[in-house]
């Protein structure tokens, strides 16, 4: 069986609220860490979310 191309990642809030999103990414085309600006409902504003591994 072949190795999966897409992997699940956790996008953790940089506002240190502990809130995170789960997303998928193509590990072959996106080799660098993903950073997205999304809404954090705990902080109630848009902040950057950085990629972390799912444990």
From Swiss-Prot:
Transmembrane segments: none annotated. The keyword Ribonucleoprotein applies. One of its GO terms (molecular function) is structural constituent of ribosome. The keyword Ribonucleoprotein applies. GO terms for cellular component: cytosolic large ribosomal subunit. InterPro entries: Ribosomal_bL33, Ribosomal_bL33_CS, Ribosomal_bL33_sf, Ribosomal_zn-bd. Keywords: Ribonucleoprotein, Ribosomal protein. Coiled coil: none annotated. It comes from the Bacteria. GO terms for biological process: translation. HAMAP family: Ribosomal_bL33. Belongs to the bacterial ribosomal protein bL33 family. PANTHER family: 54S RIBOSOMAL PROTEIN L39, MITOCHONDRIAL (PTHR15238), LARGE RIBOSOMAL SUBUNIT PROTEIN BL33M (PTHR15238:SF1). This is Large ribosomal subunit protein bL33. The gene is rpmG.
């Amino acid at each position: 069986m072949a190795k999966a191309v897409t992997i699940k990642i956790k996008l953790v809030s940089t506002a240190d609220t502990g809130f995170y999103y789960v997303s998928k990414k193509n590990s072959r085309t996106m080799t660098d860490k993903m950073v997205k600006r999304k809404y954090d409902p705990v902080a109630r504003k848009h902040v950057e979310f950085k990629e972390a591994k799912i444990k």
